[in-house]
């Protein structure tokens, strides 16, 4: 029964695992007052595994069980009572049992009830501390004076899985009403699933009001509470009626001392046994009455011999108050005999002597008729086999029934949680019938095939699909869907005096039929078949006297099982039928074994050989034509021979199917591609030029985007999984293909175009072929190289190793490009890019042949080429600087500066050095009070910190333009020497930052960068910095300006007054027209760029060019100069992590490293730049990304090194871009230490 209900007074509170960390001595000392302890225990160091408390017996006891010993206290034992167990000693009024030696403890006088209360309350206090639940509680409140007080102590539990609560008075009436009130409190305050209770608490006499009347409503409420529990045990249930029994909504019920009549009990048994209810699976009723078991047995068709067999094997003693232990002994025997009883008594009723009735749920049934199906499923494939395998080669989904197929797979491919197995119609693979994800399943996957999910498919297969690309990785053998089948009987085992009949819609068929068959020991071996479609089956057993003994009904879906048994209550008739269900291939019955033996002597035609399969059926094999068939070759017309499917080595029990033949009675499309030669049409889809042709053909592109069938067909043709002819029955795909045909050209020679049933058909009279594909489909010319060996493209070679990383890191840019250029497929591209972001290189490899991703790659290539061009400009610029030996001379400039007076020190040091020395010398920086060597890190930080102060708008020399906080020179006069020196210092700092490849922490407008290069500005340079000016000039470009009467004059507000300045000599009289408005706008832009800043810009450029010749900047665009000076604003976390190296025991999967990157993700962008400044000495990132981070003279990637202990702060080596990170204990500790280091760690020292 598994979880059996306790039908006797166990009387223990089982508190497992509560006292794990306490010894027996500690528990005893805590349970009683110190003045009650007379001696200490000798077993003081034994941990407790469980504790049992029994208060519902005449002699209450407490038992504690340890690992190797147990201790038992028995309260109030008479002196004359002795224990017989080994190791039990009696000392006064207290006894204990111990398997090991120990010192005895005793007490002479104590209050029994108070002692028990002390123990209970202490246990409750333990429960409160441990937040546990009571797994089982059994307590007799009859021995407790104040039972309500005891119960209220249990409020700490909140949940009691099993509760046994009684009032055993032992002949003395005491506190009955208090017990009832205690029960009310328990039901209202505790969650109880199983209850074992004296039922008299539910009687009206137990709920008397103060005036002596009965409270019927309270009684009913208590009874409803009991009925909602899973298991109940009702004692004193003499008021229970048969109607109450039928209303029981429980799993287990036990009724003791009831007054049910024989009629009530029999009626309940009959009604319940005939219902389908599975709620009540155990009922035990005890009482003085005797019910008519013969009547029940007769009504249930129970045989006398079975009942007698039962009685002789199960002894149960009558329960009586004089011998309460007798019933317990009987139950022990019952428990040991229950497995045997299940075999002897198959039905769900146990009747044992008159006073006990036990009802079980459905059990294993003894068989009267057994049907065993042969060869239903194949075994699991061996581990060495690769592919996808199925357990059945044919299924029989009769009516609304279903059949289960197991699918195994073994593929030499890395596991991907997106892969799935689909069920496909073999005749139309454009969509799946059912699918299961491999993320939630392990091999095998179980598919349930029904008529609903199979639709009209006659043959299906299972395919393993790549979740990234939709590519078919493996395909199973075909599974036949048999909607018409034959039931083949192979063997019948039965007594000789019994005839077996099958009752179907074809009539009554005897098994075996009246013909010659072998017969041995009552076993009839035969092999014959009859039509069996969707009907249910009746099997009748008839004795020779034609008296019907048994008629068993078998539903059609049961025949799909491997093993079927009928219900039986007798061992006298046992019949076993071995059968199989086969596809209905012919009206001719399969020959039996005797016929096979005789027919095998007939020589078949030449080249044909005869074989027997696993079921002893004959089939024929032609090794020349590689054909197999079930019928003799000489019985068919040679003009209509249809080759049949070869018998597979693993699925040899299925018949061949004629639909595998390529020759059919009617005219069909041939396997060859009829539009153009097969290879040409396949190559059309497989060539790379097809992608270009697709995106150039807007109509075809629309069909491709909207129809998944078309995309699926293209994929299968490209992978040589299916020929193009397979999809000719898809009009939309045919239309898609024909959109690539050049209809301006005539049809090829021998071709004709006709219309049939509103569809265009192309006829090839030369080859006598028909096709729906236009033969004028575009063909791509194959380009041949004149050279024997070709040199790979420099661009593709350079980017081959970086394309995966570039695609992963630039997914967001690709989404924007796709949205701008291809909005109709942007959403689909975005979904695939999400897969790439999630699964990285695995997704890139899987989607390499996807058309959408191919387009994304082409967009990335164009973008990459653009970036490569820009990178080439910067690389050329640095090569030119290297030739000029700028910043690489033999001399060295060692500058010692203070962080507190950085700007003053820069004025004092930089302006006092000759410009020629500045541009030729190497640079080394030292911060005052800090011991450090400059290998690049200190110089980078020097320029970052200096630029923040030097170019700050608060000084009045620069101001913010636009909304992006880019700086531009502020209009002002430069009359004082200080102003001139400030601008000279600005020019020199900018030039030195470029020479020493150090970034500054400011960004300028495009106008300023072009001014440094002495290049004219354009209108686009003002788009971000001065949006109003840009919109005004752009409006003039797009509209007619004749009516505006504008002249070549620049107007501006100076000191609150309108000031005008001619753009050209005589500009006030020269009007703006459509012909010269472009010139006007260009002049306006040039004037706007230098208006008010002529003098400051001249001073800054002079000092800048003294160090960096403007000729060197000719190879750069303004965007290049911006990247050289300020780096990139983009901070790609994926690029950062990808280009990080680890030392000292760290790796990318180390837990501390994982915490570090998780902390980085939670930081703001400003905090991340501060971290970069702390580690690298620069708060900017090279425009090439983190892969281009530089150390002293070469590339030096970001590095995380394990160093120090958990109490240390992180530290950095800015010259080598190295962060020394201790191995912290928690992520929170790492985050706190890192933040403190960034904020307070801007100083250097030498180890």
From Swiss-Prot:
In terms of Gene3D superfamilies, this protein maps to: 2.20.70.10, 2.60.40.2840, Hect, E3 ligase catalytic domain (3.30.2410.10), Hect, E3 ligase catalytic domains (3.90.1750.10)
Query: In the Enzyme Commission scheme, what number(s) does this protein have?
Result: 2.3.2.26
Which GO terms are recorded in the biological process aspect for this UniProt protein? protein ubiquitination; regulation of defense response to bacterium; regulation of dendrite morphogenesis; ubiquitin-dependent protein catabolic process
Q: Which residues form the HECT domain?
A: 914-1247
Q: Which residues cross the membrane?
A: none
Which Pfam family, just one, is annotated for this protein?
Answer: FBA_2
Location of the protein in the cell = Cytoplasm
Q: At the top level of its lineage, which domain of life is listed?
A: Eukaryota
The protein depicted here goes by the name E3 ubiquitin-protein ligase hecw-1
Q: Provide any one GO MF term from the record.
A: ubiquitin protein ligase activity
Q: Where is the active site?
A: 1215 (glycyl thioester intermediate)
Q: What does this protein do?
A: E3 ubiquitin-protein ligase. Functions in the OLL neurons in the anterior ganglion to inhibit avoidance to microbial pathogens such as P.aeruginosa although worms do display avoidance behavior, vacating a P.aeruginosa lawn within 24 hours. Likely to act by inhibiting the neuropeptide receptor npr-1.
Species the sequence originates in? Caenorhabditis elegans
Query: Is Oxidoreductase included in the keywords of this UniProt record?
Result: no
**Keyword annotations:** Cytoplasm, Repeat, Transferase, Ubl conjugation pathway
Q: Which parts of this chain are annotated as the region Disordered?
A: 633-659
The residue ranges flagged as biased composition, category Basic and acidic residues, are 641-653
* InterPro entries on file: E3_ubiq-protein_ligase, F-box-assoc_dom_typ2, HECT_dom, Hect_E3_ubiquitin_ligase, WW_dom, WW_dom_sf
- Enumerate the spans annotated as WW domain: 602-635, 745-777
Chief location: cytoplasm
